[in-house]
Amino acid sequence: MRRELLLEKIEEYKAIMPWFVLDYYQSKLSVPYSFTTLYEYLKEYKRFFDWLIDSGISDAPRIADIKLDVLEHLTKKDMESFILYLRERPSLNTYSTKSGVSQTTINRTLSALSSLYKYLTEEVENDQGEPYFYRNVMKKVATKKKKETLASRAENIKQKLFLGDETMEFLDYVDCEYENKLSNRAKSSFQKNKERDLAIIALLLASGVRLSEAVNLDLKDVNLKMMVIEVTRKGGKRDSVNVASFAKPYLEHYLEIRQKRYKADKQDQAFFLTEYRGVPNRIDASSIEKMVGKYSQDFKIRVTPHKLRHTLATRLYDATKSQVLVSHQLGHASTQVTDLYTHIVNDEQKNALDKL
């Protein structure tokens, strides 16, 4: 979603929220939470508050009028009823064949509510220097995590990675073969954005940056001489990220056509642009997701930009066997997150088994 549209959506949600959620929002801006995270949390709060009113737990006529003491006095049984509502709600939708929302969605909802409750019961201060209330019902609510070993998760992910020669084969496919299947009209659209699309894919495969980090790149953040980019990580921290040299020609070719192709002026500082009716704009995350999905599906298997991040991490670990180096490249504070890649690159284990 474009930053401008994202901020508009956030304002729409803020306009209907109770005062204590607005307090929470303002506090988390100072952390800072990303606008994307806050937007997702506000969506979850609306869903929760709608349920409070519909279920009769709150007699407020609208979300903005929900009182703080409603949250204070919610019971564990109330929260379990809400979780059950989430599981059953899609079955009420005649257009859905699913029996309930995924556990991942439920966990995301509960995570958003836990953050709000922690703020209200621990972090905020009233006039007396005390939190608004002390009873945190979310501490009594258990989340159910998907049961899957790292080895199982690694095997599932491995099928969606472009490892070894496939990294360059994917880029070559988009560069030289993809358009051969297109109609003249589709080919014209592809050729307009070809250099940009290749540059985006190459950057993701060569750096492992998150989708949001690529979207928010500005011209000043990219140093092609040193092959280093400056990104804003989760939590608002700035970080320097090395980029593999194979991405350089793709980035250079894009920069050669960027200004003329996308009608960019000096004030258009976004690195990756779109152009509509002569007006350049920063490309949004959904456009990149669709683009990566389209090309990858035609090449081998439909993947997300995050799988390209996994591809870089796996290739880097395979080359270095260093979880520390991989965690630094990805912007993780701990090597625990990179344990997954040791299971994807498990040739030594398989070779040992073959010798038995």
From Swiss-Prot:
UniProt entry keywords in alphabetical sequence: Cell cycle, Cell division, Chromosome partition, Cytoplasm, DNA integration, DNA recombination, DNA-binding
Active site per the UniProt annotation: R210, K234, H306, R309, H332, Y341
Tyr recombinase domain mapped to chain residues: 169-354
Gene3D superfamilies in alphabetical order: 1.10.150.130, Intergrase catalytic core
GO cellular component: cytoplasm
InterPro entries: CB, DNA_brk_join_enz, Integrase-like_cat_sf, Integrase_catalytic, Integrase_recombinase_N, Integrase_SAM-like_N, Recomb_XerS, Tyrosine_recombinase_XerCD
Gene Ontology terms for molecular function: DNA binding; tyrosine-based site-specific recombinase activity
Transmembrane segments: none
Compartment(s): Cytoplasm
GO biological process entries: cell division; chromosome segregation; DNA recombination
Annotated Core-binding (CB) domain residues: 16-121
Regulation of this protein's activity per its record: FtsK is required for recombination.
Function noted in UniProt: Site-specific tyrosine recombinase, which acts by catalyzing the cutting and rejoining of the recombining DNA molecules. Essential to convert dimers of the bacterial chromosome into monomers to permit their segregation at cell division.
NCBIfam families: PRK05084.1
Family: Belongs to the 'phage' integrase family. XerS subfamily.
Protein name: Tyrosine recombinase XerS
